[in-house]
Amino acid sequence: GNYEVSEEGIKLNFQLSGIFEYRTILENNDLYISFLSPKEMYDRIIVIDPACGGSNTGYEADGLLEKSINLQIAKMLKEKLDKTDIKAYYTRIDDVNPEEEDRVRLANETKADMYIRIQVNSHEDTSVYGLLAVYNGSYFIPGFGSVELADVLEREVATSVKGRALGLSEAQAQDY
């Protein structure tokens, strides 16, 4: 690592291999920094993944871009999650398109308890509209797993946007 001195103070720069959180202690004018894995610091971790981004606009209709809607939903979710004790990591908070491997790596490296992908789709039949929650049927947490999470999220989002819930669907291999 290195450091930079400015009028505001000293900036410490570290090159770390992996994702870490930190704790600091200032004692007798000495600064102690501990780097911890996310699981060492937080009881509950989720990864929020707004699909598309950057040059991948996703579906477009009436001037609305899927990538923008996905990101807007993620930012609204971030506002709510920032007020809880749940640690949330985001695959993107700007108009960029991370590689799929990087999106999955974030969930794996943080050892996330939940991975939530936000994705807006279209349908050939314009009378079909609403929210569909897709879950990973092979992943199970006793008492509250993928199915339960998908159900709660779909109902809550449908209620908050005064929308229509279409139900739950188990993800197929091509969805991963």
Per-region residue spans from a language model:
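Active-site-proximal helix/loop segments of hydrolytic enzymes
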Residues: 64-176
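Flexible glycine-/small-residue-rich
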Residues: 16, 35-37, 50-52, 118-120, ...
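Signal-peptide-cleaved, periplasmic/extracellular N-terminal interaction regions immediately downstream
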Residues: 1-46
